[in-house]
A protein has these predicted regions:
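Phosphate/nucleotide-binding beta-alpha loop and adjacent structural elements of enzyme active sites
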Residues: 1-230
């Protein structure tokens, strides 16, 4: 069949509307990453979906770090039945465009969702962000499984910390993140505050084993986290 019968143009991009899980999403036909996977299969990362469904409760404050085009943001909002707050943090402006369209498409109550065009790390400032030809593989790290998909282009993006964002929007009860290896820096930055009792969120993240090495090692960070009761 001809996809041209089913797609529309949004922001000069070919966008395809597809049922995903129990909601709908606009997906970028030129993206061979998350959009392509959802067009083909209508779902992804079932293990994380199951974790979120079991852990998330109404009235929670969620930090969705690496919110991308909204696959999890919509899911989180529906699980909480619009009775909670989601801080959706995403450094790519292209992804944010689709994220906003997808929230509108699903009639999500956007007053309960804050979208921040930024990355998250262990410092506040700016950092070089390497762009990939798949919308879910942009990264701070040039090595690892994302390397073959990097375009050679980069942009400088704003960087915030979880603690910095918490002071503006409240402490997170639940953190979901998919940050292409940068979970090392983010979790490490939380350890001190968790130890002090400032916060103790549920943390759900996708590990990126190929992005770890002796100088960028998740193991000691997780060991420290486990000592704090995780």
């Amino acid at each position: 069949f001809f996809l041209s019968k089913f797609f529309k143009i949004i922001f000069f991009r070919k966008i395809y509307k597809r049922t995903v899980n129990n909601y709908k999403m606009f997906l970028d036909l030129d993206d061979r990453g998350i959009s392509r996977a959802l067009i083909l299969f209508g779902e992804r990362e079932i293990d994380q979906k199951k974790i979120i469904e079991e852990c998330l409760k109404p009235e929670m404050c969620v930090f969705d770090i690496g919110a991308n085009i909204g696959y999890y943001v919509i899911m989180e909002s529906m699980i909480m039945k619009n009775k909670g707050r989601i801080i959706a943090i995403e450094p790519s402006k292209n992804n944010i465009q689709l994220l906003k369209q997808n929230l509108t498409l699903n009639k999500i109550v956007t007053k309960d969702i804050v979208i921040i065009n930024s990355a998250v790390s262990d410092f506040i400032g700016k950092k070089k962000f390497f762009l990939a030809n798949q919308a879910n593989l942009h990264t701070f790290h040039e090595f690892g499984s994302a390397k073959p998909y990097l375009t050679g282009k980069s942009i400088n993006v704003n960087v915030k910390t979880v603690i910095n964002i918490s002071k503006d929007y409240g402490k997170p009860d639940f953190i979901r993140m998919d940050v292409e290896g940068h979970e090392v820096e983010i979790i490490k930055s939380l350890l001190k505050e968790i130890k002090k009792g400032f916060l103790k969120p549920i943390i759900c993240f996708e590990p990126h084993i190929s992005s770890y090495n002796k100088n960028h090692n998740l193991k000691p960070v997780l060991e420290s986290l486990f000592k704090l009761g995780y």
